[in-house]
Amino acid sequence: MSQPTLVALDIETTGLDPQRDAIIEIGAIRFRGDRLEGEYHTLLNPGRSIPRNVVDLTGITDAMVARAPRAIDKLPELEAFVGDDPVVGHNVRFDLSFLRVGKILRYNEAVDTYPIASALLPTATRYNLGALARQLGIVLPATHRALDDTRVTVAVYQTLYQRALALPLKTLAEIVNLQQDVDWGANLLFEEALRARSRELASGRAAPGSISLEPRTLPRGLVPVAEPTPLDDEALAHLLEPGGAFAQRFANYEFRPEQVRMLKAVARAFSEGKHAMIEAGTGTGKSFAYLVPAAQWAVQNGQRVVVSTNTINLQEQLLRKDVPDVEAALKIGLRAALLKGRSNYLCPRRLDNARRHRPKQADEMRVLAKVLTWLATETPAGD
């Protein structure tokens, strides 16, 4: 089934108020899927001086629009170019608010790449058009002009559509189901993505439904030994010494005597069942100094070892970098899990409550779609 014809557009204006400010440039592109079908562009004379900040942003000067037509003469052309097709834009309601003052495009469906991106790129830190283009690998033009921004908008929409197609079918179907009573600017894209995969639904290979948050089946836990075997602190220290396992594994490994002394102190504390309070300065290599004996103790004696950190950033570093390095250097099978404070995790009860009550407003739908996509594609643990 072919995709619908869409018209992406962008305008440049003298300000932000559609009742007081005026349009100075319009750019529009008609497209269907990956195929571009036409472009429309015009400068407009606003009948007033263009503010300095707008000149700096767009490069459009009073001289450039001095002989340009007025909006009243060109808006009918734009209306004919767009027709009844849905209008795509980034924060598109801003553009449409100006155009509807001119009494055109009042009934066209609005498709907004902002909520679409918010849902499909749940971990992005910024959602302005330039930031999205950079994140998606889209080349940005040198100028901030209407037709240039429209081309970027088309590329962003097409890329996000492919992202929607790649969603798990259950997630895609649930988003479409939840958005039925809400116009949030992303309805058309998700409906088209689900329609494009309708054959997969019909074949029975997957069925729509809710994302499961049931606990996963884990392998058998550790079986602790009755009498723990003490650690060989000298053998562990050798791993960190010149020519040891770490030096062989890491090209830029640097031997640090303070690190070895700390490792031995930690190993003795494990072996003797005592507390140890150790102060070590920056550059000591503290992580390996306590992780090496901790890992060896866990594997050797079948006991869990808890490492409590002061920051989440250090937790992430240990789990994603240091623990795998220790496992590789020691050549042991090591399982590690990350446990954060309760406030760092999604509450399944609240999520299910939001699903049952269904979103009533666009912002509610955007956040719920964002969470569902995040659960399906970004996080294995809901944190």
Task: Name these PLM-found stretches.
Residues N53, L57, F98, N128-L132, ...:
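Alpha-helical scaffold elements adjacent to nucleotide-binding pockets in ATP/GTP-utilizing enzyme cores
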Residues L218, D233-G244, Q303-D383:
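A substrate-engagement module of RecA-like helicase motors
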Residues Q158-H238:
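Acidic two-metal-ion nuclease catalytic site recognized across multiple nuclease folds
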Residues W297-Q303:
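Post-Walker A helix-loop "phosphate-sensing" segment adjacent to the P-loop in P-loop NTPases
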Residues M1-E109, P115, P122-H144:
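Conserved non-catalytic scaffold segment of RNase H-like nuclease domains
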Residues S271-P293, V305:
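Walker A/P-loop
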